[in-house]
Amino acid sequence: MNRNDRRRLKKTRRGARPKGNGPEATARDIDSSLGRIAALLQSGHANDAREICQSLLAENPDDPRVLNLGAIACFQTGDASTAVTLLETAIEHQPDFVDAHNNLGNVHKAEGDLLRAETAYRQAIQIAPMYFDAHYNLGIVLETMGRPAEARDSYARALDIQPDFLPGYLNTGNALKALGKFDESLEYYRWVLEVEPRNVDAHNNMGAVFYELRRFDEAESTYRKALEIESGHADTLYNLGVLLHELERYEEAVDAYQRAIAARPHYSECHVNLGYTMHRLGRLDEAEGAYQRAIELDPDSAQVHANLGDLYLSRGEPQAALALCDRFLDRHAGDTGMLAFKSIALREADDVDGTRALLDVERFLHTTELGVPTEFADLDAFNTALAEHICAHPSLVDAPASHATRHGKHSGELLIEPRGPMAAWEARLREAIEEYRAALPNDSAHPFAESIPARYRLTAWSVVLESQGHQIPHIHPSAWLSGVYYVALPPSVAASRENTAGWIEFGQPPDHYHGKLQAALSLEKPREGLLVLFPSYFFHRTIPFDAAGQRISIAFDVLPYRGP
């Protein structure tokens, strides 16, 4: 702190002392002190602001304004716990103190407690429906929680209040991208760039959309344009690395990841991808080092643990891979991604009984007829309405690069307005899910049965395949239960008995894993109106088919939900 700052602080401390007599003088003194505290916070002197707040609170422990600013000072000095306590106390004394609710949401958001952050922002909005900050912050939280449709709506309300707020347009584009509405998201990014041509985030996010659309040349040129603006932009370097890896330009990908890490050393996802690319290059020791660093940074990441376990498999060490799985699952019971990898590790460790128990298709793979909603005359009418809705859906695009679909189209979220026939489909699906949950064995020893979510939310999308279309082996790592409903099938697929082209297959992991033993496979023949439900950690794929006609299906996830 320089001499002028010390002089200013000394004056502020003097101003914080009570002056004059009577309540009016005290109120004026507090108002004056609060203004000085706010100025200190805005100028980056949080420690000094906190010290003055403590003095004021000693005389005025119930003043919500002092409690609120004291909380901000505590948070800015790294004391989130005290900040929460002060804000909750402020709200107790003044329940309609909208700034305190919003600030409480900010602290919870920064600490990763997104559910409490959501609650705080919604309370702020209930008190003051036109409160811009709460709408915008709520959008950020909802987007982080994987609820992009709600996030888009929150951003829209924020922009209705403050239409010139550029980050709101950028984030709306991100939410639309997550919803699979790529053309709309590009419009938002382009609008941002019209206003601010050197906005590196808009260039980077636009490149990510081009990547999803498999317009790889445009993606690369857009990323490089972003890097011309800011050569050390870590997120752009990371995305460039992903693209270069996809194009099998592995050495260039390594360079991009290393530059991203140099710009942001604690970028855990970048360490994961660097390890994965090193593994592809056969540089196993360097790959292991990258994975271990990622685990240090993010010990709760199932993906990096699975990648490290796969490295052990490539070295012929299945027991080490299995031990890694068990240690992780001891801390994260029922984690979908790790259960999927454990099924590989068990097989490679020659644990036949363990593999069969984890992948028990007899107990956990369930097929049923969805049933026709009363609004429709019969199954044909219902499926025709669904097919028309899907094929006209604005989010239906050629398969995004990050998805499992090949030679087909993929929609975004279908459970958003206008839902059309999807509303009746969802109602029937929820009934089927409840029947499935109720029929599960009461087996606390099995990780799938043990991790039944008390509450859940649904997400659904469509896959439209034509000749040669298929899905490569994959899982749904964020979900507990997944499934598929068949809307329409090519006649030859519907009529097939021995030819399994177009069927769904369970058991085969993706090619990038280094298992040597053949997985046990289970096949299900699709038929229009059939609903298939299965644990989200079951690897599954669609067998390619060569036939005229469309294979239209609706896939869905049951996502554990712990919201308000």
Residues of each region from the PLM?
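Structural signature of tandem alpha-helical TPR/SEL1-like repeats
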Residues: 42-51, 76-89, 109-123, 133, ...
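Non-heme Fe(II)/2-oxoglutarate
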Residues: 355-449, 470
